């Protein structure tokens, strides 16, 4: 069975267990991203990438806090992509989507080169 956004959301919730603020934030960003993607009528593949990146965009916060005692965007951009890659690989996502999601997470706090 192909992975879907529900699988990503469930994995994000498991990973962020005990941090309802992170879970709620990810779900809010997902809802906004989904709405924007639908309004823009993007392709199915781009929608899957957008939704996945939205759910996982802050996945590096917890490890950043542990390693650097900070959840600054620069640390999230370092720590988030490897976590997202591991999670999405376990879910058997297509490599092209994994690579794009990781790129977007690595550029989450940068306002250029993320088209």
Regions found by a protein language model. Give the residues of each.
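Acidic/His-rich, divalent-metal-binding segments that scaffold phosphate/diphosphate chemistry
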Residues: 1-64, 70-73
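Divalent metal-dependent catalytic cores for phosphoryl transfer on phosphate-bearing substrates
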Residues: 48-115
